[in-house]
């Protein structure tokens, strides 16, 4: 029923793409891993939509002999786990995408950095020591979409440079095709990601996204929007991400929650650690009639300096959320010492343990966590620190879902 509803809301080619993807994965019944083998292209408004034809590679099933105390074995999955997609309860979908990054690039390689960092994470989590037993499996981002992304980076950089030197104001028509190509690229990636989320959800999996920049979670909310399930969002970030557009990009990382708020069943957006925003965003917050609630970083710090506890603030944050919650974590919500190479670092922010405490309070509240994303992790040129921290945040998110 879900697919018929979705087909009626989108174009024929997009619907066919999603249907083919669903059918291809429907054969993955016996402990298999999906590998992209070839693609077929079809026209959509003179652009292309990637249609994947999948082959299935049998994996060795998870064995009772797995030693969670040992070092990660060569060729193992995320966190060194040997489980298959079928065995795993939690699926992580990597999204290698950063077309609108406006400061430091590198988040496109965030999923790989987190995967590598996960090999250094001991599996006995302090709060959720058995989370590894649930099984965590990391999906694959299609090579064809990564190639599409990389092919559009020059257009993105040309637009951003033209904005900086004023050329785009004098000759806007020169950049219309670039904007259109980037928007079409987003739509192709979004179609794949919606189908992927829908597939794993139909299999009863818990699903988390791993970006990439913060533009990437929009399809998750579009999927939730089609379920007509009312929910709220806990958004941890240095930035409000409520701009109508940024640098002319409709799907900018700075516009993710402006776009998400168009989805009617999003009851409330609760933002934490915010410390960088524009006048337009502040006005939207003030005029939201309580739909957007912000716990600004400076206000949180002031209250704590004056004797308020982090526990009390976290209780207020949790109480602001409805019973069903989606969690969106931009790594730059943390102090930059924990994510020095992220796309747009801002002084201040949460300590690592403050974030862990807040996430635990969500879990303890009994609220249902529908899904999550972790975005904006960016590896340093000669450092694995960002990936190490990101892997630990991701592991904790797996513990609370």
Kindly give the residue locations of the regions a language model identified:
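Residue-level detector of alpha-helix boundary/anchor positions
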Residues: 4, 8-11, 28, 204, ...
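Positively charged N-terminal leader segments that act as targeting/secretion signals
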Residues: 25, 42-43, 48
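Hydrophobic alpha-helical signal peptides and transmembrane signal-/tail-anchor segments
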Residues: 1-11, 18-21, 32, 36-38, ...
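Residue-level recognition of conserved structural "scaffold" positions that shape functional pockets
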Residues: 17-18, 33, 219, 280
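Intrinsically disordered, low-complexity, charge-rich segments with an acidic bias
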Residues: 30-33, 104
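Short, Lys/Arg-enriched N-terminal segments with co-localized hydrophobic residues
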Residues: 46-61
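Conserved alpha-helical scaffold segments that buttress catalytic/binding sites
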Residues: 59, 63-401
């Amino acid at each position: 029923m879900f697919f018929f509803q979705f087909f009626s809301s989108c174009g024929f080619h997009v619907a066919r793409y999603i249907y083919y993807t669903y059918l291809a994965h429907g054969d993955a019944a016996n402990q298999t891993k999906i590998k992209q083998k070839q693609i077929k292209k079809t026209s959509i408004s003179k652009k292309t939509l990637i249609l994947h034809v999948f082959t299935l590679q049998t994996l060795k099933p998870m064995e009772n002999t797995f030693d969670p105390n040992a070092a990660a074995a060569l060729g193992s999955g995320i966190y060194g786990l040997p489980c298959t997609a079928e065995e795993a309860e939690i699926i992580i979908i990597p999204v290698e995408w950063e077309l609108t990054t406006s400061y430091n690039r590198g988040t496109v390689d965030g999923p790989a950095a987190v995967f590598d960092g996960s090999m250094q994470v001991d599996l006995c989590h302090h709060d959720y020591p058995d989370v590894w037993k649930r099984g965590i499996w990391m999906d694959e981002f299609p090579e064809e979409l990564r190639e599409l992304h990389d092919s559009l980076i020059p257009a993105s950089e040309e637009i951003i440079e033209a904005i900086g030197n004023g050329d785009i104001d004098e000759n806007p028509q020169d950049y219309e095709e670039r904007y259109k190509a980037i928007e079409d690229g987003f739509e192709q990636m979004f179609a794949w990601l919606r189908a992927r989320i829908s597939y794993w959800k139909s299999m009863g999996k818990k699903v988390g996204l791993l970006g990439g920049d913060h533009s990437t979670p929009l399809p998750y909310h579009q999927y939730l929007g089609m379920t007509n399930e009312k929910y709220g969002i806990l958004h941890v970030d240095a930035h409000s991400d409520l701009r109508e557009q940024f640098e002319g990009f409709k799907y900018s990382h700075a516009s993710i929650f402006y776009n998400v708020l168009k989805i009617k069943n999003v009851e409330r957006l609760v933002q934490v650690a915010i410390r960088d925003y524009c006048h337009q965003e502040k006005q939207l917050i003030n005029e939201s009639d309580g739909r957007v609630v912000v716990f600004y970083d400076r206000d949180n710090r002031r209250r704590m300096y004056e004797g308020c506890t982090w526990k009390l603030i976290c209780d207020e944050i949790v109480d602001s959320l409805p019973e069903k919650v989606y969690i969106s974590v931009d790594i730059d919500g943390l102090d930059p010492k924990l994510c020095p190479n992220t796309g747009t670092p801002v002084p201040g922010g949460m300590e690592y343990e403050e974030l862990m405490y807040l996430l635990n309070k969500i879990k303890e509240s009994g609220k249902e966590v529908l899904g999550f994303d972790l975005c904006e992790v960016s590896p340093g040129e000669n450092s694995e620190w960002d990936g190490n921290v990101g892997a630990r945040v991701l592991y904790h998110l797996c513990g609370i879902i």
